[in-house]
């Protein structure tokens, strides 16, 4: 009788274990499907989310107070993916990584400043373009670089470096451009501390966890990028919802302004890379890295330190840069396919 009880317990434990494995397997299969969906239709998903938030603002506006927390999770997820190899890649091609950061932090804030002047936006909206330009590269740039057959290690390294430089350089360039031309009170230290809390601390925590227990939390690491992508979409939706009236008032002009700032990043980086004879794969990565900003960070900082109107540029730019990034990647792949056919 005693042996039968033991056998029965063993059978139940084995059955529970098998059911657990099956559930995990199904869950991971769903996550992989969602990842594939995001990678294949990111631009359309972003547009759909923005349209829904614009048409149904009350459904999404309640999430606005939680934007900073969602962005912290996105940065934490980024930290979990960073390995020693990423930092080694920085030293393998240091001049290219440095060049990306130089172009990004020198040109994009200036482009935002010029766009705000050219389109004669009020200070509350104009400062959003400067803030957007002063932010580091967005994580979506790594995906777009992959789709464009670009230098992915360079893209990941450049995103990491620009993100780590952001606590100093982002508030510095916002103060430099916006502080000199706007009546809005802009202080360096509060913005510096916000970026440290929102960006630096979560990334460092992710890196530390990955270093010490990375092998034990592989399922968590697999899930985090998907949840992070959903978080970015929710941030976009929340900002679009809370600024629905402002977007309606500015209308088409705000989209044109964001497009000009975004495309200028591609164009300026292209000519710099051509002048320095940088290879095509690296040039593509650098163009995407400069042109695609961390719009979610600009939105979070705008809401915390300025007004909801300052977040409009970041919300619209999020739609624009995903579309232009997809188009650019498609052009690059088509060019490569044609070259293969010609050389066959």
Question: What is each PLM-predicted segment?
Answer:
Residues 2, 11, 15-21:
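Short, positively charged and aromatic/hydrophobic N-terminal segments
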Residues 11, 23-344:
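Alpha-helical transmembrane segments of multi-pass small-molecule/ion transporters
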């Amino acid at each position: 009788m005693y042996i039968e009880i033991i056998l029965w317990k063993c059978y139940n434990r084995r059955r529970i274990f098998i059911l657990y494995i099956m559930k995990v397997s199904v869950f991971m299969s769903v996550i992989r499907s969602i990842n594939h969906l995001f990678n294949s239709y990111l631009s359309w998903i972003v547009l759909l989310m923005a349209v829904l938030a614009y048409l149904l603002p009350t459904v999404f506006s309640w999430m606005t107070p939680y934007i900073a927390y969602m962005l912290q999770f996105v940065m934490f997820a980024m930290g979990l993916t960073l390995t020693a190899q990423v930092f080694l890649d920085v030293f393998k091609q240091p001049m290219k990584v440095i060049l990306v950061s130089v172009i990004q932090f020198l040109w994009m804030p200036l482009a935002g400043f010029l766009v705000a002047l050219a389109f004669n936006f009020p200070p509350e909206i104009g400062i959003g373009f400067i803030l957007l330009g002063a932010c580091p590269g967005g994580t979506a740039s790594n995906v777009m670089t992959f789709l464009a057959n670009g230098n992915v290690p360079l893209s990941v390294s450049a995103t990491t470096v620009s993100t780590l430089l952001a606590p100093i350089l982002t508030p510095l360039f916002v103060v430099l451009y916006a502080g000199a031309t706007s009546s809005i009170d802009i202080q360096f230290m509060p913005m510096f501390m916000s970026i440290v809390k929102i960006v630096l601390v979560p990334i460092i925590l992710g890196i530390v966890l990955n270093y010490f227990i990375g092998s034990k939390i592989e399922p968590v690491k697999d899930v985090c990028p998907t949840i992070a992508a959903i978080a970015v979409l929710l941030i976009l939706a929340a900002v679009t919802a809370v600024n629905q009236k402002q977007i309606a008032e500015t209308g088409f002009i705000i989209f044109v302004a964001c497009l000009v700032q975004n495309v200028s990043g591609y164009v300026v980086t292209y000519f710099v890379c051509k002048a320095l004879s940088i290879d095509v794969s690296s040039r593509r990565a650098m163009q995407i890295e400069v042109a695609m900003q961390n719009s979610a960070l600009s939105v979070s900082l705008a809401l915390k330190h300025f007004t909801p109107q300052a977040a409009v540029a970041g919300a619209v730019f999020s739609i624009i840069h995903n579309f232009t990034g997809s188009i650019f990647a498609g052009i690059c792949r088509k060019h490569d396919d044609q070259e293969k056919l010609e050389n066959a």
